[in-house]
């Protein structure tokens, strides 16, 4: 029996290579079997690309990454033109192989010790008032990357004392207590962790993750920091029903989560999980009404909503769709 080839540090695996060894086999989609995108998913391109080019240049110059690019977000042009970006720390290689996600899998390099300072300087130069910091999963690190998050928050606040910082964290599998101890030294202004989908779809969509772990992470952070809003995001179109998503919303509220994002899953390539349905704007409106009824303080629900989509406006309590 041949052993799997050892991953080389820093080498990105994408598409078929990425999903070759996950519990549920991914059959590459054929064009004729893929659902046609409805009109409501058309993205308007900005009249000018200059702001987009400026942000990309700033990221490249400092060796930084944005999840907007690495995960092929459909809102990249809008957000970059709006002057916002979600920074992805700890490299651009993830230790997990989630087949809905376009971020590369592989064996990551050692964290860049200068990244927190470079990130803080870039944010200052971009004159941002609200930033979202996320990361790949780093199961190779003892603390799951929590110390690097804390270092980034500290350095950002040194150079940008008026800024608001939202962090979108991985699940810190097997090390929740250690991670939360570290983050308690530099708590963010908003704590975000995505459940992504309903629990019965975790095996195919989030191999290596656990629904209850994720709920516990959100609840335990809230218990330590009752004044910091907690937030989570979900995708639709992976085979779930509206009733299943409604139950997830109830679970989130039972675990004291206050902010919600709910959007449409879009298949990054034929090697990723297929879109099983396109959810209509009317259905998103119904789920938004349920979220409001359940007591979420902020709920952004719509086809193009993503976890950090207009996060600054949502944190201000403004309507986001």
Swiss-Prot record:
Pfam families: Radical_SAM (PF04055)
Residue intervals of the Radical SAM core domain: 80-297
Keywords from the named record: 4Fe-4S, Cytoplasm, Iron, Iron-sulfur, Metal-binding, S-adenosyl-L-methionine, Transferase
A GO MF label: metal ion binding
Subcellular location: Cytoplasm
UniProt-annotated binding residues for [4Fe-4S] cluster 1: 68, 73, 79, 308
Family designation: Belongs to the radical SAM superfamily. Lipoyl synthase family.
Record's protein name: Lipoyl synthase
């Amino acid at each position: 029996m041949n052993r799997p080839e050892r991953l080389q540090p820093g080498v990105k695996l994408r598409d078929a290579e990425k999903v070759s060894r996950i519990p549920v086999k991914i059959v590459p989609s054929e064009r004729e079997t893929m659902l046609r995108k409805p009109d409501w998913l058309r993205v308007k391109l900005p009249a000018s690309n200059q702001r987009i080019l400026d942000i990309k240049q700033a990221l490249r110059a400092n060796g930084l990454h944005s999840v907007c690019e690495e995960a092929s977000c459909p809102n990249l042009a809008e957000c970059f033109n709006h002057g916002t970006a979600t920074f992805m720390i700890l490299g651009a290689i993830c230790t997990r192989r989630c087949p809905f996600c376009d971020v590369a899998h592989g064996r990551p390099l050692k964290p860049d010790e200068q990244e927190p300072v470079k990130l803080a300087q870039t944010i200052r130069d971009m004159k941002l008032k609200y930033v979202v910091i996320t990361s790949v999963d780093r199961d190779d690190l003892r603390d799951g990357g929590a110390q690097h998050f804390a270092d980034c928050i500290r350095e950002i606040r040194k150079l940008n004392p008026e800024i608001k910082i939202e962090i979108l964290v991985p699940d810190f599998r097997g090390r929740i207590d250690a991670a939360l101890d570290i983050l308690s030294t530099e708590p963010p202004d908003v704590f975000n962790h995505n459940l992504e989908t309903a629990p019965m779809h975790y095996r195919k969509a989030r191999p290596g993750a656990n629904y209850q772990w994720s709920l516990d992470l959100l609840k335990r952070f809230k218990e330590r920091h009752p004044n910091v809003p907690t937030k989570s995001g979900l995708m639709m179109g992976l085979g779930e029903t509206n009733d299943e998503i409604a139950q997830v919303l109830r679970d989130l509220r039972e675990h004291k989560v206050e902010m919600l994002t709910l959007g449409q899953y879009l298949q990054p390539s034929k090697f990723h999980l297929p879109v099983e349905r396109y959810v209509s704007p009317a259905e998103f409106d119904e789920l938004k009404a349920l979220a409001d009824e359940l007591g979420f303080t902020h709920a952004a629900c719509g086809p193009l909503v993503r976890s950090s989509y207009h996060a600054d406006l949502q944190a201000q309590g403004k309507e986001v769709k």
